[in-house]
Curated annotation (Swiss-Prot):
It is found in: Golgi apparatus membrane. Keywords: Glycosyltransferase, Golgi apparatus, Manganese, Membrane, Signal-anchor, Transferase, Transmembrane, Transmembrane helix. It comes from Arabidopsis thaliana (Mouse-ear cress). One of its GO terms (cellular component) is Golgi membrane. This is Beta-1,6-galactosyltransferase GALT31A. InterPro entries: DUF4094, Glyco_trans_31. GO terms for biological process: embryo development ending in seed dormancy; protein glycosylation.
Length: 399
């Protein structure tokens, strides 16, 4: 019994000591926590009660972060980075275009094409940088048409050279050679070229039914010779205001792939013997269907990338009977912006005259009924006098 009483007392003693220790520990821990909390409250209260001078000093030592300003800086940097990427993309695209052009020219040089072989020999020279190149399509029999243009809207002699150096504009009559090279027709053109210095000769046999081929060769040869923003094709019975044309093109200068003209969609003519007959009419669906939208052939412009595309792929591009349809078909499956600009297809007086008087001179004028100016040799001067923008307009224009 004595032993049991001792064990019970010992057990009770140990428990009491542990309880005492735990109580003291809890008290001390509580005091510590309360002191910490009181210190925090005093700090916050001190900040709130601090004087304006103390607050300013605190801000100077610990400046606040302007989150809105920081967010604006980030957005600005992102925008700048995006612009840099776009510039690099454009540069890479231009280099790819240059490489493709050089390869195509070198390939043609190996094929023995005289016109392009000369271009290959000139590849060591840097192509002149130009605003636009205008090719005026003409024929051996069109001397009077050429003279009517030289006497109106086409600068001559030193003025033509000045146009190139000051405005970056190349203008040439475009013609190939006869079916008998070195014959009378070719000698006549050579003599005319010696006099006016305004021809661009192609390695092409002239013929009315070869206009699609001539157009293709023109763009390929022009892009190999001149590095321009735009390449223009115009017929030799159309009146052009160069200042207005330049201003029109300048609005689209930053776009990589543009096709500018008066867009139309005429009927596909299946009947043989009619003008503009389409032998491959069946490709366009049922009889009576219309062509896809394309620029009318009197005048249109394409950007450098598209001219290069024609040059690189000319062996693969299909030619239809009509030149304007052929050109439109080459772009129909590409990422190209078609720009329908009606200032490029004004009618002759009174239409273009009224628009000029209203302060909106036309870029080009012709008669739809004649697919050009009717009796252009006789009427070109009249159209120029009544619809022209003024001979000095091109020199006062800034592109």
């Amino acid at each position: 019994m004595g032993m049991g009483r001792y064990q019970k007392s010992a057990t009770s003693g140990v428990s009491a000591r542990w309880v005492f220790v735990l109580c003291i520990s809890s008290f001390l821990l509580g005091v510590l926590v309360v002191n910490r909390l009181l210190a925090s409250f005093e700090t916050v209260d001190g900040i709130e009660r601090a004087s304006p001078e103390q607050n300013d000093q605190s801000r100077s030592l610990n400046p606040l972060v302007d989150c809105e300003s920081k967010e604006g800086d980030i957005l600005s940097r992102v925008s700048h980075t995006h612009d840099v990427i776009k510039t690099l993309d454009k540069t890479i695209s231009s280099l790819e275009v240059e490489l493709a052009t050089a390869r195509a020219a070198r390939s043609d040089g190996r094929d023995g094409s005289p016109a392009v072989a000369k271009t290959v020999a000139d590849q060591s020279k840097i192509r002149p940088r130009m605003f636009f190149v205008m090719g005026i399509m003409t024929a051996f029999s069109s001397r009077k048409r050429r003279d009517s243009i030289r006497g109106t809207w086409l600068p001559k002699g030193d003025e033509l050279k000045r146009l190139e150096t000051e405005k970056g504009i190349i203008m040439r009559f475009v013609i190939g050679h006869s079916s008998s090279p070195g014959g009378v027709l070719d000698h006549t053109i050579e003599a005319e070229e010696e006099q006016h210095k305004d021809f661009f000769r192609l390695n092409h046999i002239e013929g009315y039914h070869e206009l699609s081929s001539k157009t293709q060769i023109y763009f390929s040869s022009a892009v190999a010779k001149w590095d321009a923003d735009f390449y223009i094709k115009v017929d030799d019975d159309v009146h052009v205001n160069l200042g207005m044309l330049g201003s029109t093109l300048a609005r689209h200068r930053s776009k990589p792939r543009v096709y500018i003209g008066c867009m139309k969609s005429g009927p596909v003519l299946a009947q043989k013997g009619v003008k503009y007959h389409e032998p491959e009419y069946w490709k366009f669906g049922e009889e009576g269907n219309k062509y896809f939208r394309h620029a009318t052939g009197q005048i249109y412009a394409i950007s450098k990338d598209l001219a290069t595309y024609i040059s690189v792929n000319r062996q693969l591009l299909h030619k239809y009977a009509n030149e304007d349809v052929s050109l439109g078909s080459w772009f129909i499956g590409l990422d190209v912006e078609h720009i329908d600009d009606r200032s490029l297809c004004c009618g002759t007086p009174l239409d273009c005259e009224w628009k000029g008087q209203a302060g909106n001179p036309c870029a080009a004028s012709f008669d739809w009924s004649c697919s050009g100016i009717c009796k252009s040799v006789d009427r070109m001067l009249e159209v120029h006098q009544r619809c022209g923008e003024g001979d000095g307009a091109i020199w006062h224009s800034s592109f």
